[in-house]
Amino acid sequence: MTRAGILGIGSYVGEHVVTNKDFEKRIDTSDEWIRTRTGIEERRFAPDNVDTSDMAYEASVKALKAAGVSAEEIDLILVATVTPDMPFPTVSTLVQQRLGAKKAAAMDISAACAGFIYGLATGQQFIENGGYKHVLVIGVEKLSKITDMTDRNTAVLFGDGAGAAVMGAVSEDRGILAYELGADGEGAMHINQKGEYIQMNGREVFKFAVRQMGESALSVLEKAGLSKEDVDFLIPHQANIRIMEASRERLELPVEKMSTTVKKYGNTSSASIPMAMVDELKDGKIKDGDLLVLVGFGAGLVWGSLALRWGR
């Protein structure tokens, strides 16, 4: 049986570093308040002339190089984003054109902060059923363009960035072991963008995330026939350190076994998990054969988790 996994991964980080001290000068907040409630110390914003598709392209080039796969070998491009350059054409088609991935089909996925996991689960189906050999999955957001920088409740939370993964067949003892996707439309309006900017009911989102992230992580392990004792590293959506810590505690993992890139990137929505993976790989925290649990939640309300044995 064909097993789908990640062959290579890459990221793009916004060029402008915006610290908590910078926000102290703009709105009624403080570095201590932000750190205590979110764990965020700084975030990155992309320049005005860099759009979502530009960031996606840069991350994709790095992922293709890491995978040793050419753009011409990509069969499908999946872009998870809620901040496209424009309503249409899709970001995926813009990336396809820039990469020169002429034989690739292309579509965007709107699953907010869980989008990258939705993309991996979708790519897995195409690869394991024999439909496609290589799938490029991208999580990318330019949240700075839909964030009200005068709203102290949301301005300090978000950042810009992109992460891309090239998927393909891997060894039977590597790759995606199980996934879980879910949604609860009853909470749809807790995070929305009805107007120009993001609106969020932070209290309700926090309660949902603390409960659902831990439950989903445990559920995907059960689906994979594994237990929390088998987990080598947890990569949660980098939204808020308190939510992330709740997930880690549900899995009874030590602090050093969870990614915490939220402190330097903020919440980059669908890009947060692949961006974290790139950093942890560079730092040697993810090794060949490690069992990773990826888990995220987002507007919808939606959630997703994935058990992945790292390596090819």
Curated annotation (Swiss-Prot):
Region (ACP-binding): 238-242
CDD domains named in the record: KAS_III
Active site: C113, H237, N267
Coiled coil spans: none
Catalytic activity, reaction form: malonyl-[ACP] + acetyl-CoA + H(+) = 3-oxobutanoyl-[ACP] + CO2 + CoA
Signal peptide: none
One Pfam short name: ACP_syn_III
Xref: InterPro entries: ACP_syn_III_C (IPR013747), ACP_syn_III_N (IPR013751), FabH (IPR004655), Thiolase-like (IPR016039)
Record flagged with keyword Lipid biosynthesis: yes
One GO MF term attached to the UniProt entry: beta-ketoacyl-acyl-carrier-protein synthase III activity
The protein's role, per its UniProt record: Catalyzes the condensation reaction of fatty acid synthesis by the addition to an acyl acceptor of two carbons from malonyl-ACP. Catalyzes the first condensation reaction which initiates fatty acid synthesis and may therefore play a role in governing the total rate of fatty acid production. Possesses both acetoacetyl-ACP synthase and acetyl transacylase activities. Its substrate specificity determines the biosynthesis of branched-chain and/or straight-chain of fatty acids.
Subunit structure: Homodimer.
Domain notes: The last Arg residue of the ACP-binding site is essential for the weak association between ACP/AcpP and FabH.
Family: Belongs to the thiolase-like superfamily. FabH family.
Protein name: Beta-ketoacyl-[acyl-carrier-protein] synthase III 1
